[in-house]
Amino acid sequence: MKENNQKDLGPENLDWPNLGYYRDQNKILGKSEQNKNQIVFMGDSITEGWSNFYPEFFKKNNFLNRGISGQTTPQMLIRFKPDVVDLFPVAVVILGGTNDIAGNTGPSTVKMITDNIFSMAEIGLKNKISVFLSSVLPVHK
């Protein structure tokens, strides 16, 4: 018998950071000439929406979108290696934290959010990727 506080471990709960979301696209890209001078955008639905709104702009500027709707910074941090580092971009633009504030994956403190964002920045810099941080948009609970 399942306890009341146990979650169903169905397929949607086994990939909490959503590593599979871009897995097939990442395999195709790998380390190719197409990645040369590429900039990856890492974030949540706001980021994901940018390339949906203006796909030509992303394509002509060699921008790659790795935003996932509803994502929080702990999920983004786990995805950072396969969705950014392993693609060998010259730069990454990181926008995250809005869904942390909203509590999408549980309560978060400002320190938790900034630690996750700074960890992504450190990983990027250690891998010779220029890092650009976007500020969290104003939110109200």
Regions found by a protein language model. Give the residues of each.
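N-terminal secretory targeting modules
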Residues: 1-41, 47-48, 52, 56-57, ...
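Short, basic, glycine/proline-bearing loop/turn elements
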Residues: 13, 63-68
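Conserved beta-strand elements of the Class I
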Residues: 40-42, 64, 92
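Short hydrophobic segments within beta-strands
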Residues: 42-43, 134
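Catalytic nucleophile serine of serine hydrolases
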Residues: 45, 69
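Alpha-helical cap/lid subdomain in secreted, periplasmic
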Residues: 56-62, 71, 78-141
